[in-house]
Amino acid sequence: MNVLIIGVGLIGGSFALALRDRGLAERIEGVEASEEHARRALERGLVDRIVTLEEGLPSADLIVLATPVDTIPLLTVKILNRIAPHQVVMDTGSIKGELCEVVAMHARRGRFVATHPMWGTEYSGPDAASRGAFAGRTAVICERERSDRDAVETVERLYGALGMPLVSMEPEEHDLHTAYVSHISHITSFALALTVLEKEREEQHIFDLAGGGFESTVRPVSYTHLTL
């Protein structure tokens, strides 16, 4: 199987490592907007080569979207516009409601499988990618009945080979539960950072004086797009 990973960062890079370690892909190519991330992805051997979307799409059996969650809906539509009938598209984003609405009426909706592997850290980029990240973690599939059977089976086999239990949910149910178990911690971090910065205008001084506990607590503020 030839795999194209769009966004070779924490999730995309870890996914690539998992595919390699289990011999699930003959070739892994990556699409990466950041030149530095592209360089590191190649240096770490996460992908065989970095390509443009136009270069990578035709030969890919599976296309994995692992870009920031706010970019996934329109990117999914763009990819569905270009794929062949045999290709499978899946995403790894943590918000499903908007995405499933955007692709609902697309002529190739059946080739898309909306998924969310329930794993992540506060770090990002290809250097944050780690081996064994997904084993034992739950993978959620949303609107499986809207996807073609062979597309769902491809994704289920893949997640199964990575040692991930599968759960089916509707998008709204997924987003509600994810908000409780994941996004609330990001909101709390954001509120803490705003409170401290309201009192301390010199942001760098805060991190110079504060210990590692404070820094690790407010680091998820980079995820504020999840709450907007």
Give the residues covered by each predicted segment.
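Internal alpha-helical scaffold of NAD(P)-dependent oxidoreductase catalytic cores
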Residues: 133-220
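Glycine-rich, N-terminal phosphate-binding loop of Rossmann-like dinucleotide-binding domains
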Residues: 67, 93, 143
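Rossmann-like NAD(P)-binding element
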Residues: 55-83, 87
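Conserved small/polar residues in nucleotide/adenosyl-binding loops
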Residues: 224-228
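Active-site capping/gating segments
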Residues: 113-141, 146-147
